[in-house]
């Protein structure tokens, strides 16, 4: 760049900085650009599939799937992990279905969890935006998009048509929340439900509620499905769950994670820790015996899990080694491009 252009650029940057504040415009290679912080999902397998060790702070995340697939469980686990790291969390319960006792069992500090049960969609999204702008919240969960009923629909008659009202509401809210979330480094997780498109002959007939806006604004989209049952004898004690990373602006997408969700306990964290440790040869398996650093730690997987429960420092040590090995591999791959996406059709519902 010649001197005149360089001086003109410097003058423009100084003016922008004076008017809008420091770091409004930065060079992409500047050291001031920080790596994205991540909040663990509570599942080590899913953290690795996401490529950055969890869900990204300061971004919009969508978790969707069929009923009883583990969507709320996943978000409550993320809240528990965020609170353990010293974060403050909020839960906007538009479905009016949050169970405090279940949340406590999953490790959520319910005494310090902010909860709102809004009357209508506008109120829910306004509360979310105000909490984001406060700069004091690290993680907000909105459960769910389908329950964000516009005020006009609540106040209207039962048979009234309100075409595209919820889609327009979501698009307007996300335009505000996305930028505010980035500035305050607050993650906003939207739980969403699945609907069927009528008359689809080819491709998947499934779609999510609330229009297209959330698909565009979300940095991470997770599709969660129950694929089997976990049994102890004849008793069903949990479900086998598969999560597909459908969209990821932070790392390569389309990875999958399979793990168990145990009823009343949440993700079987120690079970997947043992499996990954054996897979990475951190824990050696010979027949039914498992050994770590030359010492036998149990015969059979259940005994190893019991040993790790009694020795949490060893499970923490093993987890740190797994994260170091697998997340380094993930970060070496080319990240997905964070393309500029066009504004979605507001009226599509």
UniProtKB/Swiss-Prot annotation:
Acidic residues: which segments have biased composition?
339-349
Query: PROSITE patterns recorded for this chain?
Result: RECA_1, RECA_2, RECA_3
- Cysteine pairs forming cystine bridges in this chain are none
Q: Where is this region: Disordered?
A: 329-349
Set out the biological process GO terms recorded for this chain's protein. DNA recombination; DNA repair; SOS response
Which SUPFAM superfamilies does this one have?
Answer: P-loop containing nucleoside triphosphate hydrolases, RecA protein, C-terminal domain
Q: Which residues form the signal peptide?
A: none
Q: State the protein's name.
A: Protein RecA
The record describes the protein's role as: Can catalyze the hydrolysis of ATP in the presence of single-stranded DNA, the ATP-dependent uptake of single-stranded DNA by duplex DNA, and the ATP-dependent hybridization of homologous single-stranded DNAs. It interacts with LexA causing its activation and leading to its autocatalytic cleavage.
Q: Spell out the coiled coil positions from the record.
A: none
Q: Which family does it belong to?
A: Belongs to the RecA family.
List the source organism: Acinetobacter baylyi (strain ATCC 33305 / BD413 / ADP1)
Is DNA-binding set as a keyword in this record? yes
């Amino acid at each position: 760049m010649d001197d005149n252009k360089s001086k003109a650029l410097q003058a423009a940057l100084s003016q922008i900085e004076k008017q809008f504040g420091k770091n409004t415009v930065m060079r992409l290679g500047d050291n001031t650009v920080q790596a994205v912080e991540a909040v663990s999902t509570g599942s080590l397998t899913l953290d690795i599939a996401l490529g950055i060790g969890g869900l990204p702070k300061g971004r919009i995340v969508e978790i969707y799937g069929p009923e009883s697939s583990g969507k709320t469980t996943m978000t409550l686990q993320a809240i528990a992990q965020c609170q353990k790291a010293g974060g403050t969390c909020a839960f906007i319960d538009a479905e009016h279905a949050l169970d405090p006792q279940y949340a406590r069992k999953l490790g959520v500090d319910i005494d310090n969890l902010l909860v709102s049960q809004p009357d209508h969609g506008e109120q829910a999204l306004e509360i979310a935006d105000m909490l984001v702008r406060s700069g004091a919240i690290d993680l907000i969960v909105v459960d769910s998009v389908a329950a964000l009923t516009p005020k006009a629909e609540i106040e209207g008659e039962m048979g009234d048509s309100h075409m595209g009202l919820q889609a327009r509401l979501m698009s307007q809210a996300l335009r505000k929340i996305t930028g505010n979330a980035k500035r305050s480094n607050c993650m906003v997780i939207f739980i969403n439900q699945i609907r069927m498109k009528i008359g689809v002959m080819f491709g998947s007939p499934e779609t999510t509620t609330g229009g297209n806006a959330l698909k565009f604004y979300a940095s991470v989209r997770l599709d969660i499905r129950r694929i089997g049952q976990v049994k102890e004898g004849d008793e069903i004690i949990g479900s086998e769950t598969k999560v597909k990373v459908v969209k990821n602006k932070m790392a390569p997408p389309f990875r999958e994670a399979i793990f168990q969700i145990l009823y009343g306990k949440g993700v079987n964290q120690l079970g997947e820790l043992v499996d990954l440790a054996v897979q990475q040869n951190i824990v050696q398996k010979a027949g039914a015996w498992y050994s770590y650093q030359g010492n036998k730690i149990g015969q059979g997987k259940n005994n190893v899990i019991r040993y790790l429960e009694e020795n949490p420092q060893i499970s923490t040590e093993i987890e740190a080694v797994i994260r170091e090995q697998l997340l380094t591999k993930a970060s070496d791959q080319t990240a997905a491009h964070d393309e500029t996406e066009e504004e979605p059709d507001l009226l599509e519902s």
